Amino acid sequence: MWGSQHRSFQVALWFLVLAVFLLVGFLHVDFRLLIPDKVQEPPVTNIMFLKTHKTASSTILNILYRFSESHNLSTALPEGSRVHLGYPWFFVTRYVEGLKQDAHLQHHFNIMCNHLRFNYPEVQKVMPRDTFYFSILRNPVFQLESSFIYYKDYAPAFQRAKSLDEFLADPWKYYNASVSLKNVYAKNNMWFDFGFDNNAPADMDYVRKRLAEVEQRFHLVLIADYFDESMVLLRRRLRWQLDDVVSFKLNVRSQSTVSHLTPESQERVQHWCALDWQLYQHFNRTFWTQLHAELSPRQLTEEVEQLRERQRELMALCLQDPEPKNLTHIDDQNLRPYQGGKANILGYNLRHGLDTTTLHICQRMAMPELQHMAHMYSLQFPDKTPKDIPFLKK
């Protein structure tokens, strides 16, 4: 009798220990890892991307063009010989090819992603009501440094300054707000792209209202300084497949043209581009808040590595060398990028002997922005005169 009770006690004790063990494990489970991706839901196909300047936005444009072509979607492309949607003027519908000019007509496209100065009422005439709006920002220190090199010969504010350090030491010596349409690249350029006054005082009440406006109209603002993390979040929001957001870096400069600003100059950028700085600071915070709400740290690490691994696989499949090349070392002129200002923009060489399907994929991943835009234009408007890319004829 006593032996039977003893055995029953041992069994009960064993089950109690097991229950405690399972409970501890249960409490430490990250349930977000157990929730599968919503791959069964249809992908988002109505998308407006505000393409800001010098923010890795050319790479995102490539991603959107590829998705548009592979899913047979319509894209709001620049009209006629234009390469932008009216920039730096405010966007209006007449800048879009194939859009009949009728005050009462709304012609909806699936994707809009070329450079424009944001004008929400006009964009609404082009895009469907359920459009997903997103954009991307970059640390203004690095954004302005890139702009200085790229627009050195175009922006009057940059032309006489020997370096960005020299410009920032006394910017009003070089900057004239009255020629703002050419000088937008020299002061609060991202703020300007969102449709705001880049010369406005950085008054807190004004800034707060404009930030609230951006939050109201845009579902997501990405951060170029964390590009891979941005692609992970974008993929989840759009419910796309991994390959849809894998990319090769486009419109990148050689390191020899990158300036390293002094600490004093970096601090001066925060004051000179105060509107851009507050825009960036605000949406850098919201980006990480959204990212951490969506993924656990472990899940984020895994998905970023998954993205990078797939990029390495495609680079090995497509490219002769994963390192981008100078213009003179790019064999195919259709893969030679436009050269802006003092920047040395790099591109890629594809492997020889690729089969037709692989070549199709690789060409589009490596295709520079202007050539890709011309390609999309020919696909969508085969009866119209093809886009002219003058620098390819040199």
UniProtKB/Swiss-Prot annotation:
Transmembrane region positions?
9-29
Any Gene Ontology CC annotation: membrane
Cytoplasmic side residue ranges read 1-8
* Membrane topology listed for this record: Single-pass type II membrane protein
Q: What is its EC number?
A: 2.8.2.-
Q: Name one GO biological process term.
A: sulfation
Q: In which pathway does it act?
A: Protein modification; carbohydrate sulfation
Q: How is its activity regulated?
A: Strongly inhibited by Cu(2+) and Zn(2+).
Q: Which residues lie on this side of the membrane: Lumenal?
A: 30-394
Where is carbohydrate linked to this protein? Answer: N72, N176, N284, N326
- The answer, when asked if Acetylation is one of the entry's keywords, is no
InterPro entries, A to Z: Gal-3-0_sulfotransfrase (IPR009729), P-loop_NTPase (IPR027417)
Q: Which domain of life is it from?
A: Eukaryota
* Top-level EC class as recorded in UniProt: transferase
Annotated localization: Golgi apparatus, Golgi stack membrane
List the Gene Ontology MF annotations in alphabetical order. Answer: galactose 3-O-sulfotransferase activity; galactosylceramide sulfotransferase activity
Establish whether keyword Glycosyltransferase is in the entry: no
Q: Which Gene3D superfamilies match?
A: P-loop containing nucleotide triphosphate hydrolases
Q: Which UniProt keywords apply?
A: Glycoprotein, Golgi apparatus, Membrane, Signal-anchor, Transferase, Transmembrane, Transmembrane helix
- Sum up the protein's function in the record's words: Transfers a sulfate group to the hydroxyl group at C3 of non-reducing beta-galactosyl residues. Acts both on type 1 (Gal-beta-1,3-GlcNAc) and type 2 (Gal-beta-1,4-GlcNAc) chains with similar efficiency.
The Swiss-Prot or TrEMBL record describes its family as follows: Belongs to the galactose-3-O-sulfotransferase family.
Q: What is this protein called?
A: Galactose-3-O-sulfotransferase 2
Native organism is: Mus musculus
